[in-house]
Amino acid sequence: MKRSSTHAEELKLRLMTIELLQAAKQHYTYRELSSKTGLPVTVLSRYAKGHVLPNTERARTLWKILKKLVGLEAELGRKIRFNKNGYFDNTWIVGDFNILRQAASHALNTFAGRRVTIILTAAVDGIPLATMVADSLGVNLVIAKRNKEVGVPAFLEETYVLSNSGVTMTLYVPKNALKRRDSVLIVDDMIKTGETQAALINIIQRARAEVAGVYSLIAIGDDWRERITLPKGCPIEVVTKVRPK
């Protein structure tokens, strides 16, 4: 069994390296990639087109090089944008399949060994990432929505006030979606004030489930940390932090 697991991991690395190479091809020519990797253009082309897979040793070498060029942090750095009013524009992040795929793999590696039975996110921008993470971890996804759905008999709900606007917000989760024995990982594309994540934590605790951790691609500043209270030893993983404009 151990031998099969090793082969599976090696194959996964080789396939993920090809995916990174295909992502790199969006920003660099084959000639540029050849210069950076030391591999002939023809070899890189065959890899990128899926005609052949690199062996494990070459995949490891390529992975290290490509990760610096188009790895998760590098890609986020390219896509993070603020508009003229200083508001964060996540349009080019939540729909980027390369970023979502890498983020899901990163979440899998980060929370490996921890018990996670449910992924919880708030509608709407966190849904693509949460879906990918749930698929990667092999667990179900629960979405906290801003409106009650017809046909759902009972809800867990949490109301909070958005600090910057004074607007009241309520999140609703079907009552039977979270069970007492669940260990719930909160996933979102961005943490700004921490209020949404704090509300999700309260919903989990109201269901008497366990908080497994919080995972986010981006965090704006550090003020949000004051609003998020997690059980001792419960991790918060943020891929990239940016300063508020």
Where are each of the predicted segments found?
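Alpha-helical residues within the helix-turn-helix
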Residues: 35
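Active-site-facing substrate-recognition patch
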Residues: 5-27, 31-32, 48-115
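Short Gly/Thr/Asp-enriched flexible loops that form oxyanion-binding sites at enzyme active sites
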Residues: 129-137
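Short glycine-rich phosphate-binding loop at a beta-alpha junction
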Residues: 116-123
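Short, glycine/charge-rich flexible loops or terminal/linker lids adjacent to PRPP-binding catalytic cores
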Residues: 139-184
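Active-site/ligand-binding-proximal alpha/beta "capping" segment
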Residues: 179-182, 186-206, 210-212
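PRPP-dependent phosphoribosyltransferase catalytic core
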Residues: 2-13, 201-245
